[in-house]
Design a protein with these regions (language model features):
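Chalcogenol-based redox active-site neighborhoods
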Residues: 1-162, 167-171, 178-184
Length: 184
């Protein structure tokens, strides 16, 4: 089911976390913090909306790194009901797509809940003070095909954050598959 992100809650502080990466390391938000901003992305392996923009995400994150913005991807989906989103498949997905940023597993789903993440992809763009400035889309999709007419909305927003510490006032929500929550 297609789910859209809510509007940006400007200034909301990033929630600290410590999660395991596909490299087997425990990584914290504090370690990831970029000099000019931090991009936290909730993604997964199986969602067609994520798959459609994975190349764009990787390219954007590589470019953002050059301007002092660090990026991290987190998968919070329930791998029991969605085996394609298992930790082993996360490792394969990160390697296949040449992730230059950490890909973390949120096994308890506490991080996704703390961030109020709703879908994959769900982007949280923070300034250098870890204050939320962007909660929009990567770029426009038409029939799950990215419209590549210049830099992505995500890149432009994060570049603005790096330059001014503030995100764009007008943001188009991200849309994708709902997070696959565990049910006890």
């Amino acid at each position: 089911m297609l789910t859209q992100t809510p509007i940006c809650d400007f200034g909301k502080k990033a929630i600290p976390f410590k999660l395991k990466s596909t490299e087997g390391k425990i990584i914290s938000l504090e370690e990831l913090k970029g000099e000019n901003g931090t991009l936290v992305m909730f993604i997964c392996n199986h969602c067609p909306y994520v798959k459609a923009i994975t190349k764009d995400i990787v390219e954007d994150c590589n470019e953002l790194k050059k301007i002092g913005i660090n990026s991290v991807a987190i998968s919070s989906n329930d791998p029991t009901n969605y085996p394609e989103d298992s930790f082993d498949n996360m490792i394969k997905f990160a390697k296949k797509n040449n992730f230059s940023f950490p890909y973390l597993i949120d096994e308890t789903q506490e991080t996704a809940k703390a961030y109020d993440a709703v879908c994959t992809p769900d982007f949280f763009g923070y300034n250098k003070d870890l204050e939320l400035q962007y909660r929009g889309r990567s770029r426009e999709l038409k029939n799950l095909i990215p419209i590549r007419d210049g830099k992505s909305d995500l890149y432009k927003a994060m570049k603005l954050i790096a330059e001014t510490n503030n995100g764009p006032k007008d943001q188009i929500p991200s849309a994708g598959c709902s997070i696959k929550w565990k049910f006890d």
